[in-house]
């Protein structure tokens, strides 16, 4: 989930990486973020509740898994299998986005949705439920061989077990249109900076 001026777990730079697991003070919609458990795996994929039983997620989640249930705020809801609707762009091309309805209605959590693209240099808060990160930094050479801190040109975090809903902050560094193999969309990029502060974040695998 993305909100301006405000997506699954995100990776944060601060501490041991386990922080920010409850709603931020200036909450842009924590209660609207849920997840789908992918079949035959122990992983989940992020969904956002829009209201009136409608959810949105990446189309590739539906393509690979055809999920039957969604979990939101601790409760599980069955998906109406006839409600899946793929989103198209104004040009008529398919986007990597799909909406669906649940059979029963979740609580009504108000959600504000932007009517325009997020501009460059805008501050964003990301909420997601993707993979966790390792406690300590790992280091790589310029050829991406694993090394130690003394020989490292690049540093970052490798994946850890499990996933956790988490939030973080970043700044939009650029925008572009792209095809991810499942549809065309307008997107934006953020950079995971070492000096970005304890809430500096980047989206993780399964943050779809």
Where are these regions (language model features)?
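Glycine-centered structural positions embedded in regular secondary structure
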Residues: 45-47, 128, 168
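Protease-domain processing segments flanking chymotrypsin-fold serine proteases, especially trypsin-like
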Residues: 1-56, 65-72
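Short, acidic/hydrophobic/Gly-rich beta-strand patch recurrent on exposed beta strands
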Residues: 34-37, 98-101, 191
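Conserved catalytic-core segment of clan PA serine endopeptidases
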Residues: 12-24, 67-166, 173-177
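Extracellular trypsin-like serine protease catalytic domains
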Residues: 164-208
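N-terminal compositionally biased, intrinsically disordered segments and leader/signal-like regions
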Residues: 42, 89, 148, 191-192, ...
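Short hydrophobic-aromatic micro-motifs
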Residues: 50, 55-58, 100, 127
């Amino acid at each position: 989930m993305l909100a301006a001026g405000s997506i699954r777990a995100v990776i944060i730079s601060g501490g041991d990486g386990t922080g920010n697991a409850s709603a931020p003070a200036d909450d842009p919609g924590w209660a609207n973020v849920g997840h789908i458990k992918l079949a035959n795996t122990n992983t989940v994929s992020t969904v956002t509740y829009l209201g009136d039983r409608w959810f949105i997620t990446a189309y590739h989640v539906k393509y690979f898994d055809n999920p039957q249930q969604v979990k939101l705020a601790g409760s599980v809801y069955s998906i109406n299998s006839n409600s899946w609707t793929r989103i198209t762009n104004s040009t008529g091309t398919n986007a990597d986005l799909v909406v669906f309805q649940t059979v029963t209605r979740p609580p009504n959590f108000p959600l504000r949705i932007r009517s325009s693209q997020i501009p460059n240099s805008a501050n964003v808060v990301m909420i997601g439920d993707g993979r966790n990160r390792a406690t300590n930094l790992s280091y790589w050479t310029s050829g991406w061989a694993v090394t130690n801190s003394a020989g490292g040109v690049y540093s970052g975090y490798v994946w850890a077990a499990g996933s956790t809903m988490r939030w973080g902050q970043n700044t939009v560094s650029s925008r572009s249109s792209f095809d991810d193999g499942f549809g065309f969309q307008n997107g934006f990029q953020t950079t995971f900076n070492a000096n970005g502060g304890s809430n500096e974040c980047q989206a993780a695998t399964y943050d779809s």
